[in-house]
Amino acid sequence: MLGTFEEVLAMPGRYLNDHCLIHHDDKWHLFGIHGNVRRPEDPIAIESSILHATSPDLRAWTIHPNVIERTGHWPELTHVYAPHVIAHHDRFFMLYCANDELGTQRICLATSNDLFTWERYDGNPVIVPSLSWSKWPGFGLPSRNEARQLIGRHDTVGIKDHYRFIARTGGTYGGCRDPHINLMPDGRFIAYWVSRMNESFGHNLVCVAASISEDLVHWQEIGPVYSQTAWPLDDEPTLEVESPCVVYKDNRWWLFFKNGWWTHVTSSPSPFDFRGQEVHRLGFVHAAEVLQWNDEWVITHCSADPTDYEYRRSNRTRGLFLGRLNWPTGHHPRLV
């Protein structure tokens, strides 16, 4: 399950992580997490701006100035990351994530007329999970001092300690990240995002949740649409379900998501509930975006060498990769 990928955007000394692609005026626009390559023993990279690049063909890229820089004020105290962009009424809407000083994640909104200049929405954040089902600060999560006693300072530990912190505390501080927006047939928008569920629903549950909107500004939560038990720390590098990408094809909604080393895919006739559907392991792909281009289904990969399926030597060192899917009607997709 290692597909053939071509590196189409290399940034020596830097890496690309979760990203999105949108086509406008004969150009592809890429927005994504980026950062400087660090040694494994160094602190977790601070991803404090959003990269912007353009391409006529998904292969030759021009990098432009960053479009979003963290403000240093709530809710953007430490990180801004994981953007997703959609067009509506001659404007562009970007949902992106922001972290406060505790690492609590919230989804914010920015808008643009040209994809180059962006204005934040004054009412940010626009999406946070409901306390009725989510793990959220003050509701079953440790305080800052308790976290320090577990492993030391959360913002200055290495990557292995970070995952150990997640395992011991039952999750990140208030998970709400990695939005992916789709236009539904009825004209409303649905945003998928990831979080963790509280213990009343079961032990150590992670999920893809969703919210709906008529204007991309005001969002009504649906709640979890897919959930599973998190992977054990010793077996996989990523405890969370993350990086959802949803595609409508063959009268079904196809949900791609990352968990562990792998990207998985499931589908449902409803965009609101993927639970109980068959899940297929697609392969080693990180933060995949799936789209149709020139009559082909293509898939992106990022951050690591596509042959380094255990992230042993290349995590957060590589740029954007492009691969292909074999996706016949009536079947789930496979890497080419």
Q: Can you say where each PLM-predicted feature lies in the sequence?
A:
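Carbohydrate-active catalytic/glycan-binding domains of CAZyme proteins
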Residues: 1-336
